Amino acid sequence: KEVGISDDNSGIMDITEDVANGTDIKNVYEIEDIVFEVDNKSLTNRPDLWGHYGIAREFAALAGRPLKPLEVVDLSKYDSLPKVDMKIEDELCQRYSCIKLDNITKNVSPVNMRIRLFYCGMRGINLLADLTNYLMLEMGQPMHAFDSRKVEKLRIKRFDESFSFTTLDGIERNIDENTLMICNGDIPVAI
């Protein structure tokens, strides 16, 4: 917390042994940052601007500069993986993608990822939550990670009546019949 990279003040930050004593922490982690405040009224109407890459594309177009392309990975090699039990049960949802990851042994995010999330107003939680939040900020695509031991049958649907739902931030929200929910079978687990 003292060096301005996290709200976490619970303990001592570990720095690898290859960093010499007395090294400025700014040379170890990406702490210094430039903040652009963009008053963009079209953000809500332009989903392509919801992420950092979309904003960068807009800036590149306005400045007449080339945009560094994203590295694209061929996902077809994952086509043979076992399918996740997922069904879209409402035409309001046009697409929902998911993949199951196993054998994740690391739970703590890299420090630079936690720093970037902190600068974007988000707190680090764990590796998978931080990764989905990081990608959401980068690409503008909301994501969520579920524990496959607890969520077995993903269903995307609406409910006939409104109900209360407590989100991860602890806020109880009123969900109306027009809101798509991600469910474990018939039990809502996310909006």
Predicted region positions:
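Loop/turn positions that initiate beta-strands
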Residues: 1, 125, 177-180
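Residues that scaffold, gate, or flank divalent-cation-dependent active/transport sites
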Residues: 174
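Active-site-adjacent structural elements in folded domains
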Residues: 40-43, 100, 167-168
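Active-site lining segments that contact anionic ligands and/or coordinate catalytic metals
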Residues: 33, 151, 178
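Short beta-alpha junctions and helix-cap segments that line functional grooves
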Residues: 167-169, 177-178
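Phosphate-backbone binding interfaces of nucleic-acid-interacting proteins
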Residues: 1-76, 190-191
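Glycine/proline-enriched, intrinsically flexible loops and inter-domain linkers
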Residues: 63, 67-164, 171, 182-187
